[in-house]
Amino acid sequence: MSAKDYGIFLPIGNGGWMLSTTAPHPEASYAWNKRAALHAENIGLDFIMSMAKWRGFGGTTDHWGRSLESMTMMSALAEATDRVKIWATMHANVHNPAVAAKMYATLQDVSGGRAGMNIVNGAYAGEFEQFGIWDETLSHADRYAMTELWTEAVTRLWSEDSVTMHTPYFDLVDCESRPHPSSQPTIISAGKSEAARAFQARFADGAFLAGDSLEEMTELSADVHARAAANGRTCKTYSMLTVVQDETDALADKKVKEWGAGVDREALANMRASWGVPEDQARAWASGAVGEAAFQTAYVAGSAQTVTEHIQYIVGEADLDGLMLIFPEYDQDMVLFGETVLPALRAHDEAGTR
């Protein structure tokens, strides 16, 4: 068993990853994110990642109505840290590949070789209609076809002195982008569709997967590993997990109930509608959703022992290469996790490699 990677999903949007009026409410500020990044550095996590979001979901909490821009914030955090990997998110439908290539070559230089590019293809119409770049004629498959060509262009610009490409989505003519990065930035991609997994196997170094069950997660992880191997490559698999840790299971469960009681149903409905669910159906679902819907990912609640055992179980059973963690209370929770759970996970990994 190889050592696993553990990192955090930074709270780059207000409210972090909880849609609740009673949960902790990180603000969309550099100060918040810098503190979280420094906690990650100090406790020994492997990476920090931020999303890219252009429009929030309203509701009582105005969830993600305020968010920072991923690339500029992560460049600042690269300067503020020394060790953790710096993974920023880039929309392939927003940025010309020549612009993206130059930006990430710069981040790779600033970070001393720690940069990573989380590539997303822009699936939510509401984010991009507001500034006139949503192409409603592109299907899901078309967006991945565009993203494959975009990624090919970026990676070629990182290593070739001149690139010419003519595609339905962009044109490069004798395009130069120097200096080249000292090493290629890590490429990350999230998604579980057939098109997403095909893209991950061909281009990504890491894939973020979300299964509706542990069985599905296991199947997805095995599929991405196998597809990448068939392409002569290695692609690590990750999932996301929210950690609610306290001294006892009962105290952690109490937090879950308190935060669930304040679930922001309007924001939930708006989020679901952004996925393409008809508005009446989205609102009907949100009105009947249980409080746990306030959590945007799977979660574990409990003592240090409970959290440790749960993480070991899901990572082992699904053959994941790591997890990206979310902490509702970043300041105190990350310190507690670093003092208790993370050392146990590292010891478990080390024992497994002997």
Question: What would you call each of these model-derived segments?
Answer:
Residues 4-8, 48-50, 86-90, 115-119, ...:
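Hydrophobic faces of well-ordered beta-strands that scaffold small-molecule active sites
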Residues 98-105, 247-253:
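Catalytic cores of alpha/beta
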Residues 17-30, 89-98, 181-192, 243-246, ...:
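Active-site mouth loops of central-metabolism enzymes
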Residues 2-4, 8-12, 38-42, 123, ...:
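An alpha-helical appendage that flanks or caps ligand/catalytic pockets
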Residues 61-87, 146, 342-351:
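Alpha-helix-loop-beta-strand connector modules within alpha/beta enzyme cores
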Residues 40, 44, 77, 107, ...:
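Conserved, mostly hydrophobic/aromatic
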Residues 80-83, 111, 202-208, 318-319:
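Glycine-enriched alpha-helix->loop->beta-strand junction motifs that scaffold or abut catalytic
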Residues 1-80, 180-185, 256, 283:
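N-terminal beta1-alpha1-beta2 module of alpha/beta enzyme domains
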